[in-house]
Amino acid sequence: MKTLAVVSALLSLAAGLAIPEDATPLEIISSRPLTIEERSSCPKGGDLPKGALQPTLMVPISKNLPDVAFGPTWNPIVTPNDFCTIFNLVIPSSGFNKTCTLEFLFPSHGQTFSPYIYNGAGHFTFTGYAFFSGATPETTYNNQPPPGPSPPSPPAVLAPGNAYVINAGPCFIPEGEASMEVSGALCSPDTDLVYLQTENMGCPIGFYVVISDPEE
């Protein structure tokens, strides 16, 4: 109960201001149901293939506290029209001429031991930033990375018990580059979401990138 009270106090910082005008709704390419039985069958890493990439840095920002740097976290937080979390991912050189698939894995409480809070209608937006840019521990709402491509789509719902493909396409890493940093901010107009990003507590939860050969 004490933990819940602390998180509830954090969520109470949301004051109902509008989300950024350049925020783009999440593009859900496909989804698949996760069943209760999957937790017992999920090895370490769950259903993620070998080599799946997880965020290298996650930084919350707040529209109501636009100059406050909250620093790195493994517990992303999203609140209605206030807190967003920026996710950095680094694409290695092995992604050259490959397909990158951005997934959001969202198991139910019965499928993961990772604690999370989810409350609301489940609408989220994802604002992309320019390639080779991303958040730093000092990033705030007022000094976000420069804008970049975002997956255009109608409003989408993320709900527990599902695994979502947010976007899939060329990795775009130039030939000869050792790596390329990509990033984006997850926000919501109507939903509280706080979770522990992990792939080691039953089924994995959070954002991941899977690199694969392009389909012919």
Model-predicted regions and their roles:
Residues 97-101, 170-190:
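Noncatalytic modules at the cell exterior or secretory-pathway interfaces
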